[in-house]
């Protein structure tokens, strides 16, 4: 699940604690992966460290990776993975050099072959709703695809039937306070 907390969560301990309580509820319901968009903000680092300490048994990652600093921050706090919004082979190589899982986000399908040539085994397709009629996942048996873009928990079964191994629950499924 991709959680996009409201900006005031980073500066307000009460809001952080409420957010952590909400996250705990969905973890108790079976959530295995959680990612929050990277922010160039010390308070983001603090919140992510709190998540890492409070929930050591789930996979926690960062999204919207844009530069080497965002990867360095994710490495520094011990995140399990990060996701790029767009394909960037320089960032992908930097992540690989640092032995860190960076999942490419492909907005343009013409980048798919390039990502595969870099031996990407997990690829995020964004926005998935625009790509579903033209992308046959059965042609890529060794790749794990993740669907993203305006999806909710209610979309899970549909995208699983299309061959996606996971979907990212975004703003449609989590408005910053409530889960659908």
Which role does the model predict for each range below?
Residues 1-78, 94-99, 153-154, 161, ...:
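Conserved N-terminal beta1-alpha1 strand-loop-helix module at the mouth
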Residues 67-80, 110-119, 132-135, 141, ...:
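Catalytic cores of alpha/beta
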Residues 32-41, 58-66, 71, 78-88, ...:
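Catalytic beta/alpha-barrel core
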Residues 81-91, 125-133, 162-180:
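Glycine-rich phosphate-binding active-site loops on the catalytic face of alpha/beta enzymes
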Residues 56-58, 144, 165:
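Short, flexible coil/turn micro-motifs enriched in small/turn-prone residues
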Residues 49-51, 97-100, 118-121, 139-141:
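Short low-complexity, flexible loop/linker segments enriched in glycine and/or proline
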Residues 2-4, 146-148, 170:
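Short beta-strand segments
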């Amino acid at each position: 699940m991709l959680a996009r907390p409201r900006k005031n969560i980073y500066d307000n301990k009460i809001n952080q604690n409420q957010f952590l309580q909400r996250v705990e509820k969905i973890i108790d319901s079976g959530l295995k992966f959680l990612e929050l968009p990277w922010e160039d903000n010390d308070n983001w680092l603090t919140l992510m460290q709190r998540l890492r300490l409070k929930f050591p048994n789930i996979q926690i990652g960062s999204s919207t990776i844009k530069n080497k600093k965002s990867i360095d921050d994710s490495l520094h706090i011990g995140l399990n993975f990060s996701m790029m919004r767009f394909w960037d082979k320089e960032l992908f190589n930097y992540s690989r050099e640092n032995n860190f899982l960076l999942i490419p986000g492909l907005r343009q399908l013409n980048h798919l072959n390039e990502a595969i040539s870099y031996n990407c085994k997990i690829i995020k397709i964004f926005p998935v709703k625009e790509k579903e009629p033209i992308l046959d996942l059965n042609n890529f048996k060794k790749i794990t695809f993740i669907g993203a873009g305006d999806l909710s928990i209610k979309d899970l079964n549909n995208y699983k039937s299309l061959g996606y191994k996971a979907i990212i629950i975004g703003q449609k499924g989590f408005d910053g306070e409530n889960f659908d």
